[in-house]
Amino acid sequence: MIEVSLFGIVLGLIPITLAGLFVTAYLQYRRGDQLDF
């Protein structure tokens, strides 16, 4: 049942990854063109 476990992990990571990318893009958008990390 390794495939089922990996499938569950992937399904759990996808929303987290999308949320992280959305938050990062939103923060960069609010900061404007300031790209000093």
Curated annotation (Swiss-Prot):
Biological processes, Gene Ontology terms: cytochrome complex assembly; photosynthesis
A GO term, aspect molecular function: electron transporter, transferring electrons within cytochrome b6/f complex of photosystem II activity
GO cellular component: chloroplast thylakoid membrane; cytochrome b6f complex
Subunit structure: The 4 large subunits of the cytochrome b6-f complex are cytochrome b6, subunit IV (17 kDa polypeptide, PetD), cytochrome f and the Rieske protein, while the 4 small subunits are PetG, PetL, PetM and PetN. The complex functions as a dimer.
NCBIfam families found in the cross-reference section: PRK00665.1
Family note: Belongs to the PetG family.
Protein name: Cytochrome b6-f complex subunit 5
Organism annotation: Arabis hirsuta
High-level lineage: Eukaryota, Viridiplantae, Streptophyta, Embryophyta, Tracheophyta
